[in-house]
Swiss-Prot record:
A zinc finger (C3H1-type) spans 75-104, 115-145, 243-277, 283-310. Although this protein contains a RING domain, intrinsic E3 ligase activity has not been proven. The lineage of its organism: Eukaryota, Metazoa, Chordata, Craniata, Vertebrata. One of its GO terms (biological process) is protein ubiquitination. This is Putative E3 ubiquitin-protein ligase UNKL. It is an enzyme of class 2 (transferase). Residues 1-22, 326-358, 375-400, 442-520, 545-566 are annotated as: Disordered. The gene is UNKL. It comes from Homo sapiens (Human). Isoform 4 (C-terminal) interacts with the GTP-bound form of RAC1. Isoform 4 (C-terminal) interacts with SMARCD2/BAF60b. The keyword Ubl conjugation applies. Disulfide bonds: none annotated.
Amino acid sequence: MPSVSKAAAAALSGSPPQTEKPTHYRYLKEFRTEQCPLFSQHKCAQHRPFTCFHWHFLNQRRRRPLRRRDGTFNYSPDVYCSKYNEATGVCPDGDECPYLHRTTGDTERKYHLRYYKTGTCIHETDARGHCVKNGLHCAFAHGPLDLRPPVCDVRELQAQEALQNGQLGGGEGVPDLQPGVLASQAMIEKILSEDPRWQDANFVLGSYKTEQCPKPPRLCRQGYACPHYHNSRDRRRNPRRFQYRSTPCPSVKHGDEWGEPSRCDGGDGCQYCHSRTEQQFHPESTKCNDMRQTGYCPRGPFCAFAHVEKSLGMVNEWGCHDLHLTSPSSTGSGQPGNAKRRDSPAEGGPRGSEQDSKQNHLAVFAAVHPPAPSVSSSVASSLASSAGSGSSSPTALPAPPARALPLGPASSTVEAVLGSALDLHLSNVNIASLEKDLEEQDGHDLGAAGPRSLAGSAPVAIPGSLPRAPSLHSPSSASTSPLGSLSQPLPGPVGSSAMTPPQQPPPLRSEPGTLGSAASSYSPLGLNGVPGSIWDFVSGSFSPSPSPILSAGPPSSSSASPNGAELARVRRQLDEAKRKIRQWEESWQQVKQVCDAWQREAQEAKERARVADSDRQLALQKKEEVEAQVIFQLRAKQCVACRERAHGAVLRPCQHHILCEPCAATAPECPYCKGQPLQW
């Protein structure tokens, strides 16, 4: 890395600092470093929301970053101070503290010489050129002209050069780290050597920030890179034991500030996030944002996000990994490997050798975490795989985990499936493709192939598996229908359906043991604990094609009657489900219209209030001017001596008109000319 060596040499030689643009220099030097003069007078209009250029409270105050002559910073841009009080904004060491203070908005780190405007913002700009997310004071660059090179610490450059030479355990294959991002590398290497469990990605996903740091706060200098939590606001509940969504808890987070998790009455059993750490490192998150933007993560191997594409599959399998491990019959059929490949089709064949190792790692999760598969995460995985979208999108919203619902009777199975899908997000369900599937199914049922399709539709009984419902299948492709992703080929040695006599399927039961074993034997994409392959028909050739059952055998009169009634019943259920979907969509549209109307009314009310306030200020100003004029006129017409009667007498020889007649008769001389010589 020649650039690092040159930069280190330049830093050691004391080369002049780089020239900054005027706007960048102003923010680096003055942003939140001085107290707002208007706030002390209660006149600052940028307090709520807080968008002022200056600080209002001490915990918003930012120290000015400086690079000394020896090439070091006055405070570290990476290692946080453990003695800084985030509530009061006071540090015992004062401004001389060599560590980073976690101010409001993390301004000391974002607006440091090393990080300010060194990365591109992922959000767009509005009509005024301001960031739509961070506003006017966005610390990231919007466009190539807004980028600035980072200012590097000389010790960091030396450590980076040592890492390149292999002195810190990097050796060959070390990525080209950008300047100013190598923080606590020696500590990370030391912890990895002391505790090799942190090298396991699954252990990091489940244990990051879940245990308190064993070191005293003053001895732990990792800060941002420490895999343990130091206070309750930094704590992350173990996702193996607690299931919670990525949505912040309304009792803990008010506005943009996170409060104490003890404010929530639900405690650790709450289904919402209690800290910024729980929200940022949620198991359903995707790729690490630092890796995506800069190609380097300061947390290193302790990061709970995915650093490479191939590890994203484990994140997607978080909510359904126990389905692969709870059934002993899944080891012989080879189905778990196929199911994993269906979960992440974009990873290709090279992942085949890694599935066994990941299976062993996930076995630890299954021993601690009982089989309670997440409904909505399974639906999200199936919908994502059916739409052909990869899992590397950093903006994909993680599906909130829900409780596993018990399997109901056969008459409500379709409603439960569609209800769970609607709980996830209504826009994920392709209504048009569902209607097309129903129309094509009606055409197949009423056409000439209808009686023939019932010849080989008798279900095949598989020992130790859940009985199959012989009646729900979409003739369209699995990638176009929202229910098509639930269809999976049935594994195991099964004979031809033509050799099996017709029989009426037994009713479905919701036994936990049977449900868990059956779900683990088929596919991790089942809804409410039901495997996706339970909706398949068994064709004569046992093909994984999602087309409806069309057997070439002769029509059977014995199986036509019961299956025809069953098909009619399921068709009625689908019509009812489609009607409910339309009702949901209409209700959602109505709510959206009402919300839009409320937003418009709120904006109009704010505009009217602003106009009324400006009119009020203008009216008060005019009133004061009129009152001043009236007072002046009244005083101009009164006698200056008695202040009661109007002046009417003209004094001589000065010709002043300031006294009334009685006062002019008694006054020996003009009050205005008193003490002044008369000009003749």
